[in-house]
């Protein structure tokens, strides 16, 4: 069984993407807490590998990730790719509960307290045939550098 961590594609959620393109990565995960992500295409590569080599995966739980960054580090990556400053802003947890509900509140509380624990260096060593994308590689492959040109900077 493969267990993917948070999807890099979550950055396409409207409010998240618009905020980033306007220079603000807003997230309820603490600034000092590493957050693991993976590209959906990398999940597909692992699924294909599991079918090709079932003996390695049957009865096993393999947590998979390609990137591990704190939110300030992720903001720096977005800044490099977009060619303009992106700053991290921590969202207060009570806002998460109020606007997103109990389930999202519990999920982000878990991210802040524990979070995913995929061993990325070990995954890269054990499965060299799968190129696990870093956040920067994924952003560039997805064309985020072009997206930045279509959004006006915030006033003020």
Label each region the model flagged.
Residues 1-87, 94-103:
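Oxidoreductase cofactor-interface core, primarily capturing Rossmann-like NAD(P)-dependent enzymes
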Residues 93-156:
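A hydrophobic C-terminal alpha-helical subdomain
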């Amino acid at each position: 069984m493969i267990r993917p961590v948070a999807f890099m594609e979550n950055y396409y959620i409207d409010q998240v993407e618009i905020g980033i393109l306007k220079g603000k990565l807003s997230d309820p995960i603490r600034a000092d807490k590493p957050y693991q992500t993976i590209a959906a295409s990398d999940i597909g590569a692992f699924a294909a590998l599991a079918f090709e080599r079932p003996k390695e995966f049957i009865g096993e739980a393999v947590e998979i990730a390609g990137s591990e960054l704190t939110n300030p580090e992720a903001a720096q990556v977005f800044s490099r790719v977009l060619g303009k400053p992106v700053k991290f802003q921590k969202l207060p947890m009570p806002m998460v509960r109020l606007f997103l509900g109990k389930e999202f509140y519990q999920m982000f509380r878990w991210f802040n307290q524990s979070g995913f624990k995929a061993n990325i260096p070990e995954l890269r060593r054990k499965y060299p045939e799968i190129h696990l994308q870093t956040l920067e590689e994924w952003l560039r492959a997805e064309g985020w550098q072009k997206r930045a040109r279509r959004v006006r900077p915030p006033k003020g």
